[in-house]
């Protein structure tokens, strides 16, 4: 598959890049994408939920009423789960929700996601660019020139550039990441993947 390289003004540079078939025309594995996205979402969970059981609730040393003669069932503590203010039976406990996915499956998932995006025509290649200073307006103008201002866009850089990242931070539908760090979830969650030309080579080296 060949794509024309655009400049930040939205015009063609006259250059054409050929996408690596091993990455952008791979066999799509829905199951690999499912496993990877599931692990990403699971690993985001804090798992800090907790309810106190009868041994952890404050108080409860006193017997609520005498053993016999009240007509009620016998009770030994005011913090029994049967009483108001008592502990919780089988309540939530802190746990780790993390899921492990093999590196090969993660790579397959990312290749599948990029292939899906390429088949949809959702990959745009732009020449490398940097800004002199942090300017959200400048980044918004680039997206408008490329016709991506109304689309949820994942922009891939060859390496971290703080000015570019911070220029795009306040644009609601834009996410800027280093090409190596783009996850399967990031790719699938976007409508368009905007790739800087040098970043394209890094992706192909990593996943090819």
Swiss-Prot record:
Cellular component annotations (GO), alphabetically ordered: ribonucleoprotein complex; ribosome
Acyltransferase keyword on record: no
GO biological process terms held by the UniProt record: translation
Record field: compositional bias (Basic residues): 60-71
Source superkingdom: Bacteria
InterPro entries tied to this protein: Ribosomal_uL4, Ribosomal_uL4-like, Ribosomal_uL4_dom_sf
Pfam families named among the record's database cross-references: Ribosomal_L4
Record GO terms (molecular function): rRNA binding; structural constituent of ribosome
Record's keyword terms, sorted: Ribonucleoprotein, Ribosomal protein, RNA-binding, rRNA-binding
Coiled-coil annotated spans: none
Gene3D superfamilies noted in UniProt: 3.40.1370.10
Region (Disordered): 44-89
Keyword Mitochondrion part of the UniProt annotation: no
Annotated family: Belongs to the universal ribosomal protein uL4 family.
Function: One of the primary rRNA binding proteins, this protein initially binds near the 5'-end of the 23S rRNA. It is important during the early stages of 50S assembly. It makes multiple contacts with different domains of the 23S rRNA in the assembled 50S subunit and ribosome. Forms part of the polypeptide exit tunnel.
Assembly information from the UniProt record: Part of the 50S ribosomal subunit.
Record HAMAP family: Ribosomal_uL4_B
Name the record gives this protein: Large ribosomal subunit protein uL4
Upper lineage: Bacteria, Pseudomonadati, Chlorobiota, Chlorobiia, Chlorobiales
Name of the gene this protein is made from: rplD
